[in-house]
Structure formats: structure tokens, C-alpha cells
Amino acid sequence: MPKAFFMVRSVVIEALRQKFDRWYSQQHLPMALTEFKCEKCWRFWSAADAGVHYAVYQFADMARLDAALKSDGFKVLVADYDKTWPSGVTRTRDMLTLAEERSA
């Protein structure tokens, strides 16, 4: 079964970027790692658009990702995000299936 990834893309206004970065690193990412029970996760800031932040969570397969997104823990994460960022941050989510992986 191929790996599955959950990606959250957030667009953050400039005035909130430092606060958002600190919150995501210190609070939300550790909480998500615990609640999702994912294999690992990454965070990125876009080099092309400084206000775009990505968080990516890796799961063993799509069934595990689906289960994580149906969990009470996911509802807690969404509520925490919405409460902390009622304005100034917008987000979209996507579910990805690994199609191919190569090494040099």
C-alpha cells in the first residue's frame, strides 16, 4: 500500500507570520503528531510566496489517513486552529497518495 499524506496549506498575513510560526511549531504540530498518530510530519514556508505555510503529515496508507481525519482528535485540532486564527489566516487541505518515490 502506498504512503498517504495530509497537506494543510495556510496563507498567513504578514503581521501574523511570526506568531503563527511559533504557535504551529510549539503547539499545533506537536498536538497534531499526537492526535493523528502519523509516521512523521514536516513544515515549510514557501520560497515563492512568503505568506504561504505548508504542513505535511505522512501516514502508512490512505486507510490510516482516513481514520485520522474521522477521529475526535482531528475535530479538536480544527477547533484549536479556528479559535486561534479567526482571521488573518486561511487554509485549504488535501489528501495525497504517493505515486512514485526514487532515490539518486
What are these regions (language model features)?
Residues 1-4, 47-49:
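Short, flexible turn/loop "capping" segments at secondary-structure junctions
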Residues 3-11, 54:
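Active-site-flanking beta-strand signature of metal-NTP-handling nucleotidyl enzymes
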Residues 11-15, 60:
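Structural beta->alpha junctions
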Residues 15-35:
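K/E-rich alpha-helical interaction surfaces of small helical-bundle regulatory domains
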Residues 16, 51, 64:
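Short phosphate-engaging motifs
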Residues 30-54:
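Short, glycine- and small/hydrophobic-rich beta-strand elements in well-ordered beta-sheets
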Residues 35-39, 58-95:
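An amphipathic, aromatic/His-enriched active-site/gating alpha helix that lines ligand/cofactor pockets
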Residues 95-104:
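Short, low-order "capping/linker" segments at domain edges
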